[in-house]
Amino acid sequence: MELVLVFLCSLLAPTVLASAAEKEKEMDPFHYDYQTLRIGGLVFAVVLFSVGILLILSRRCKCSFNQKPRAPGDEEAQVENLITANATEPQKAEN
C-alpha cells in the first residue's frame, strides 16, 4: 500500500512543479524583449537616415540658398527710401 501511495505522489510531483512555474510566469506579466526593441530601433533609425540622405541627394527640396546675401545697411536704405518717397508725394486735398 505504501508503495502505491509513493508511486501516486511521484506522479503528482511534476504537475505541482509545473503549476508553480506557471504561477511564477503569471506573477511577472511584464517581460520586455530588449533585443527585439534594440533591433527595431536600429532599423527605424536606418530608414530615417536613408530617407534624409535620399531627400538631400534628390534635390527635390527647393531651398533658397542661391539668394544674394544682403549687406547690413540694405534694410535701412530701403526704409529711408520709402520715407523720402512718401514725403515727396503731393498731399491729396481732403474733401
Curated annotation (Swiss-Prot):
Residues 19-35 are extracellular. One of its GO terms (biological process) is potassium ion transport. Regulatory subunit of the sodium/potassium-transporting ATPase which is composed of a catalytic alpha subunit, a non-catalytic beta subunit and an additional regulatory subunit. The regulatory subunit, a member of the FXYD protein family, modulates the enzymatic activity in a tissue- and isoform-specific way by changing affinities of the Na+/K+-ATPase toward Na(+), K(+) or ATP. Its main location: membrane. Residues 1-18 form the signal peptide. It is found in: Cell membrane. It is a single-pass type I membrane protein. It comes from the Eukaryota. The gene is FXYD6. GO terms for molecular function: sodium channel regulator activity. This is FXYD domain-containing ion transport regulator 6. InterPro entries: FXYD_motif, Ion-transport_regulator_FXYD. Belongs to the FXYD family. Associates with and regulates the activity of the sodium/potassium-transporting ATPase (NKA) which catalyzes the hydrolysis of ATP coupled with the exchange of Na(+) and K(+) ions across the plasma membrane. Reduces the apparent affinity for intracellular Na(+) with no change in the apparent affinity for extracellular K(+). In addition to modulating NKA kinetics, may also function as a regulator of NKA localization to the plasma membrane. Keywords: Cell membrane, Ion transport, Membrane, Potassium, Potassium transport, Signal, Sodium, Sodium transport, Sodium/potassium transport, Transmembrane, Transmembrane helix, Transport. The chain crosses the membrane at residues 36-58. Residues 59-95 are cytoplasmic. It comes from Pongo abelii (Sumatran orangutan). GO terms for cellular component: glutamatergic synapse; postsynaptic membrane; presynaptic membrane.
